């Protein structure tokens, strides 16, 4: 199945609710979202929660929250596999009746004994198909005894090469002789991943599946299930894994790996969306900042690389800053608000004047509060170098009165400060850093005169008089 005018594209993201939404899963969801949107298709969300031991409702909720925050709005769902058990049972029965699957009554001990014998003989460990040779009478006898059973797919002996043209990796083929009669339904009645996902994807009309390359071993099994059920297979595409900068698999030791952690650290969803869309994909080597619509228009599975993608935090910080600069100052300040309130600070209208001065120095929304704590409170932090500047104890007497009498803009403030320094016999390069330390507790920052203009006049004068 390929993309053409008559195909209604439907992609899906199907996470297991066993934890937070990992950035790797978020990237998979994002690729499927972009693919569907590019072709006017449908993006479906399915929660694969058939494992009651590990699946938690709170994780499901957190995944939905993270996806919404990231801008991955689904068109259909969320469906829950746990509510579809009757559908899996229906297709299990169909395969049993058609002789394409069979009940396996082997115990764990019998299977381990089988594998041990194979190991001793130097053979690959695999199921030997013994239960496929049971007579109907033997099956009935075991059922009447209430013996538990799994259900296995009867892999055709003459199937030969299983091949598909991967949307990302190109032609892939595997010999069916490498596969044994694998389990479709466990002895507790729950479907295996491969069985449930095939039934779900087909009955939900999924046409294209983009997922991690760790699913490549699952693909031939799924193709065999599609064939057993007489269904057309969707298009498959397998994307490379994500590595940390040290070229090992991305994990907590590389920093945050959950989407909600990036939200809480002050990254814009637009920026993380942009970053993840380029993680392993390349469009223009000279450009890294895109809007969502541009990424939708550009998306092409063939542009996804064959090698693992490296998660570069510095690149994410850069993209985040650029997206902050793209926002109107009013909207950026509104995005900053929760981070200020978390520190017990209130956003005031005059803070808007600080945005153009500070945005170039910000990497995240949190940074506004860290860089400019002095606009929220007189109890601001004083950095080490500013403490050294303050220790010089340069004169301030009468300065507040001179500033109070002038027009409150950068040019007039600069003129007053220069004249004052000259009158006191102090070089401006020595005096201006001292003034910055007095009013902000910082040794570096935006233009001193523009900073003073942006700050409330009474706040600046109060601090000059107090010091």
UniProtKB/Swiss-Prot annotation:
A motif ('KMSKS' region) lies at residues 249-253. It catalyses: tRNA(Glu) + L-glutamate + ATP = L-glutamyl-tRNA(Glu) + AMP + diphosphate. GO terms for cellular component: cytosol. Its main location: cytoplasm. ATP binds at residue 252. Keywords: Aminoacyl-tRNA synthetase, ATP-binding, Cytoplasm, Ligase, Nucleotide-binding, Protein biosynthesis. It is an enzyme of class 6 (ligase). A motif ('HIGH' region) lies at residues 15-25. Its EC number is 6.1.1.17. GO terms for biological process: glutamyl-tRNA aminoacylation. HAMAP family: Glu_tRNA_synth_type1. Catalyzes the attachment of glutamate to tRNA(Glu) in a two-step reaction: glutamate is first activated by ATP to form Glu-AMP and then transferred to the acceptor end of tRNA(Glu). This is Glutamate--tRNA ligase. It comes from Coprothermobacter proteolyticus (strain ATCC 35245 / DSM 5265 / OCM 4 / BT).
